[in-house]
């Protein structure tokens, strides 16, 4: 197959003004995708023979991009002998020595020299051969033009020489902050005799064409909840992102909020970064301090130090409880994790009508609704995110951004306006058993689970739906209607944010990573759920009839989800939302607690269609993947402190290859004694002999210091390539494999 031909087009103009007008037309058409180029520059020569680069542009229609990539290549073509070092500053001067011979041998120098005369200007554009006619039309005011063609092999030597010449202007991005640049020019007694170095001015710059990144995280949601993964909740935005890109059906999290968030933002295992439990309850042992080690810089910090602007919005849950408030210490707050701006709540849960809002390093209190309307956090969260994006673009048209959007949904309390819950009236009347079966069948139909997958059994502790009284069914069905409406509203607001990215024309070059859950669906509502989740925290269990009697004071069961309630649903609904797996939140031992939906899109690079990827992936893989996709290395030194390598493995290799061998082959899981080890498809696990929500004094004493012996826990064994849902325990058949994996865990 013949090499694709590259054309370098040189257009001569009688004045700089005429050239500038055509250059602007070209860049506008490139940005509008009417024509494609690799790079373009405008060079002028005044009456005294002084030569200077006036304008530069890249393949995205961005102007003033400096000397990187194709722009630097064109500067190199023109630099010797037409451009002296004093004309283009240190960057051009660096190119002259190494690049000159290659450029002259190519014959391109003669073409440029003939076009550029005193008092005139030239526009030089580089493009693929099939774009030449469109570029010539855009540069239609030129008095003359000539084109030189070279194939990819022919210009490789030129570009290699340019890259070597430009090397001294490429910072070491493994050391952060990037050290101040040394002045690359020369200072004489006058400006005219001095060598300029404009490269010192902009500060850290992201790699050429670096994409934006939008990372969305839903809270306390399960594998079998969203319609995109076969569940009963409408998720059109999750569908939209899936259809633009890829679906990952073996993405894993830790089984609890804070540990997953720490793993997600650092690319490291949760114990390595001090978050073995939730942030509110740090402990006096390594791995449980609730404090991020300075040797584990989060990837938002890496982005921010490399030319990105970073914003975090929504639920945080990574600040220890004792650090809340005006005394800090603020190195435990979001800005210290690499965010230039934060708006949201620091705690692990909040009412959606009355959150305590923190902005940057200041707690600003509980917002009020406008015009007599109730305040609703999900709407304001999205408004604030969009306002930030607009503000970033109003100041800087080109700087790439990273936006972390973390909802309070679907963590209890399940707050949502009644009209959203009413969309699901009657849809769950047949109960959680029917929901699981229906979801499982849709998952097989969609290809989310393999056709030979087994639906795991309902735990004996959970009541069968058909065994319930009418009073119980009345309460429980409304609990699920409220939860579904709450969840769909969150997806709707994610859609508003993606629409805003599209409206500013940046969706094509934005990586969208949408994760439906930081752990499995929450079973903390106990067997009965509650009209007010604080009953759980205080060890109070109210029977359904008692709950119905109490909520009659506030408008009856239809009031669930309103400002007068703080509801959570019954644990069997969480189990249903984790279909087809066992258990849920807090249970690191089983996939119901650790496997969640993820979809990824990047229109500029990922082929649309929702193709499924089944390689093992984990929250710690997100950071390494983002860094690889945007063209940045891991940091090795931050603030003078040597960094621990990220534990995660980039899954960028899966974007274009559904059948690629998985590279993340070993991973441990552990939360509150519930634990598992994954290795080469095998999964060994053990859980405490208790229900996740059982914090009674008797149970706490049974598992307290001196009483609990982890060696007595019963381990299970699964081979996931043949058992997607973790349904068949092989511990008795393969005891040697189980012992081998237990040793790997410890």
Predicted segments, located by residue:
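Cytosol/matrix-facing juxtamembrane amphipathic
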Residues: 3-28, 34-45, 100-168
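Switch/connector loops and helix/strand junctions flanking conserved nucleotide-binding motifs
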Residues: 52, 132-135, 523
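Short, low-complexity, glycine-enriched hydrophobic/amphipathic alpha-helices that associate
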Residues: 57-103
